[in-house]
Every structure is written in C-alpha cells, then in structure tokens.
Amino acid sequence: MAELFRPVEHERLAVEEWDESRAEEAIRVIVADTEATFDGSRWPWHPGDGEEDEDPNDVYFGGAGVIWALHELGSTGWEDAALTFIDRQRTRPVLDEFTVETSYSFGELGIDLVAYRLTGDAGVADRVHDLVLAQPDSEANEVMVGTPGSMLAAEAMLAWTGNQLWDDAWNAASERVEAARDPDGLWTQRFGAEEARYLGPAHGYAGNMRAFANRGRAPEPANLEPHLLREDGLANWVSREGSRPDEIRVQWCHGAPGMVATLGDLLDLELALAGGELTWRAGPLAKGPGLCHGTAGNAYAFLVLHRRTGDELWLDRAHAFALHAIGQVERERAAVGRGRYSLFTGDIGVALFLRHLLDGEERFPTMGPFDP
C-alpha cells in the first residue's frame, strides 16, 4: 500500500462547534496584535522561521506580506512602511538565487507590487514593470522566484490599473514561461547546480498553470499520473519528480491541498475530491496554523471544493480546520510569548484565511485572480 501521508506530521482535529463570532474575534485579535507590535521599522522575527533576518522586507517572511494582508483586512496607514521596505530591500545584498530582485515572494518585485497597491505611486509602478520584464534568462520556472511570478505581478497591475501596458508585460512573461515548458508539460526548476521538477503551487507545475489559468489561458494540462498516488478513494501528489516515500507531504506548497486549491477548477472532479478527502483524513498539520505548510493553507482546498460542488460538507470541513488553526495560533502565542508575523507562515495569514472563509472567498493570497 502506498503511503499517502505521514501521520506524525498531523494532529488530531480539535472537536469544537463552529461559531462565526469566534472567527471574527480571532481576526480582530490578530490584526490588533500585528498593528501594535510593529516598531516603525519591522516586526519581530519568530524562531519557527529559522535563522533570524534583521530586516525582513519580502512578501513571504517579511513586512510586505504582512501589510498586504493588513490592507486586505481593512487596516490602514501602511503606505510609509511599504516604501521603507522598498528602500531597505534595495540596499540589501542578494544572498542567494531566491532573493534576487525579480523574485515575487522573496525579492523586490513583490515588495514593489504591495507598495503600489497601497500608494498608487507611478514611480513604483515603473519599477514593477522593469522587474517584470527583467527575467529573460531565469531558469527558476516557479511563481515564488521565477518568471511565473512576474506573470502574477503583471496580472495584478492590469487589474489595478486597467492599463494595456500590463497586458503586454503579461504576454511577454507568459511567452517566456511557455517556451520553458518541458515536452511532457512540466517545468524544470534550476537553481545553480541544483535541478528538480516540482508539482505544487509554490515551486512548480500547479503554480505555473494557475498563472495562466487566472486569465483563462491555461495550456494543455500535463499527464500527472506518473506523479500521483491513489488508494481507497484518496489521492496525493509527490512533491517533485522522483521524490522518496518519506518526502510525501500534505501541505499547500507540496501535496494534495495545494494541488486542489490551485488547480481545483482544472482537475477532473473525481480526482479533486480524492485530494480533498486525503487532506481531511490526514488532519490538521502539526507544523502550525499558517498558509504555506499549515492548517489554514490546507483548508483552501475545502473552500475550492465547496465552490465547485456546492456540497456543504466541504464548508463544514473548512470550518473545522479554521477552528483548529485558531487554537494553534493561541497555543503558539502562549508558548513563545508573542505572535508570528509573516504572511505565509504567521498569524496574519490565518486571519486572512478566516476572512476569506467568512466572506465566501476561496482565492489563495498572492495567487490571483486579482480584483480591481
């Protein structure tokens, strides 16, 4: 029997009756704490996010992602902070292939995009445009670092401005991404001497397809059967071609939750349901409540399936994961003595998921489609 998930990476689901006011209060507490903890320059680093970064500015770990979420949650007054993050990022050395200036999640591109959303500054828009067109030789081929992320940035700017310039920029980026596709429909991600072919939304196929599908231009899907694990009505996808059995994941970034949340409208319905069922059976993630590899991120798969099928079962499951994620936020805050301040791994991402759940919204943050 194939191992579709590893129980040690999951928790027993907390049994709690759904209460909308509990979710609203959790949002209020998280937003208030996040606003109050900002020291005018940054939020404190969390030990769960690895080696401390003195000045985290980016969308994934840093301040830009936090203020993106705060803005979406109705918090105001972050324009100066957004511009500060840009200035600070431009003086930082590029540490590795992930922090290049054209990176959507870890570099200047995403920070500039957030700053434009908050300020409408024409100079910032020009810089976003330059960065979108600055990746002709990128071999990252993933949304977080490579040209697919430039597609998302151009799509967002088109939605926010209506300017044809951004349609042209999107087309230029999309042509590069399509040209980089492998004959079997996957993409190869290359970072220095390292090479892999990932399946999930953060680093591979699903995210790239989403960047096309947001505008109704998804190319012919790849045959993912060689990378699919099935058993008793459940389904999961390996994280990358040739993954070892002990590398199986059930997360947004890698595995069934992210594949369903990102490609739920493109997948065969039976397969999407099998991926959702696997996500439910595996249970909340022990890694924490966040978006990238946490309980809230996994629950987006349920929201997508609820929208696609109309079956209230999936909404009930999203409610259950939401309550569990709230409990995880509260326990972690008590253990560490403060919150966790990042969009993809922290509390504010959970708050944004809760807002989406309450508002009937299933779009995963930063992945589009984007509203005007």
Please place each PLM-identified region on the residue numbering.
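Low-complexity, Ser/Thr/Pro/Gly-enriched N-terminal "stalk/linker" regions
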Residues: 1-63, 68-84, 168-183
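Structural signature of alpha-solenoid helical repeat scaffolds
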Residues: 18, 51-54, 58, 96-99, ...
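Long, well-ordered core segments of solenoidal/helical folds
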Residues: 25-42, 79-98, 122-140, 169-188, ...
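Terminal, non-catalytic domain-edge segments
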Residues: 1-36, 214, 265, 304, ...
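Extended ligand-binding clefts on enzyme/binding-domain cores
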Residues: 164-266
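Loop/turn-rich, solvent-exposed surfaces of beta-rich toroidal or solenoidal domains
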Residues: 279-314, 321
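Well-ordered alpha-helical segments within folded domains of soluble proteins
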Residues: 6-9, 56-72, 102-117, 142-158, ...
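Structural helix-adjacent loops and short alpha-helical linkers that scaffold large soluble proteins
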Residues: 13-28, 70-83, 116-129, 157-171, ...
